[in-house]
């Protein structure tokens, strides 16, 4: 780390959640901002945001975490085709691992290789009613493999 980076980390502090730079309080829904939404070491999100490269780096970190969560929670999923693993990982990314695990019928069907039933279970859900196009694409991938 450069001398400047060390100095700024010390002076600004490292904050891993968005905070109001004027008050130091975390930014949460319903709280009025006084200053600027800031994260990391002084990164003002409303002034600079993040770059596409930074967004992709964050995404890759999130994907690695989701893959581990899915394999830890559903070890049998490692035997699925790559496309079907991607479906489960994408669902866990969107819904959280706890949300994915609520699809008990879908997961049981996928585990026994009944992909039509797994896809049907996906489509018969609140998730599918809330995000119908996405759910239809994911169900088609589950069916086709």
Language-model features and meaning:
Residues 1-26, 43-48, 52-56, 60-61, ...:
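Long, amphipathic alpha-helical surface segments
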Residues 4, 35, 84:
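Residues that flank catalytic or metal-binding motifs in active/ligand-binding sites
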Residues 7, 38-40, 87-90, 117:
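Structural recognition of the beta-strand scaffold that forms the well-ordered cores
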Residues 18, 38, 79, 92-94, ...:
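Residue-level preference for alpha-helix termini and adjacent loops
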Residues 28-31, 79-80:
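Short, conserved, surface-exposed binding loops centered on an aromatic residue
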Residues 30-44:
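Short N-terminal mixed-charge amphipathic segments
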Residues 77-93, 98-101:
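Mid-chain, well-packed structural core segment of small domains
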């Amino acid at each position: 780390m450069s001398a400047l980076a060390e100095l700024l980390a010390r002076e600004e502090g490292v904050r891993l959640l968005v905070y109001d730079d004027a008050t130091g309080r975390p930014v949460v829904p319903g709280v009025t901002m006084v200053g600027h939404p800031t994260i990391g070491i002084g990164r003002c999100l409303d002034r600079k945001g993040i770059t596409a490269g930074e967004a992709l780096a964050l995404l890759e970190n999130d994907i690695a975490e989701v893959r581990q969560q899915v394999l830890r929670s559903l070890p049998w999923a490692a035997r699925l085709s790559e496309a079907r693993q991607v479906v489960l990982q994408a669902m866990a990314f969107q819904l959280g691992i706890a949300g994915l695990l609520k699809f008990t019928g879908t997961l049981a069907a996928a585990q026994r290789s009944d992909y039509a039933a797994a896809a049907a279970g996906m489509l018969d859900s609140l998730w599918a009613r809330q995000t119908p196009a996405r759910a239809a694409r994911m169900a088609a991938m589950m069916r086709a493999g």
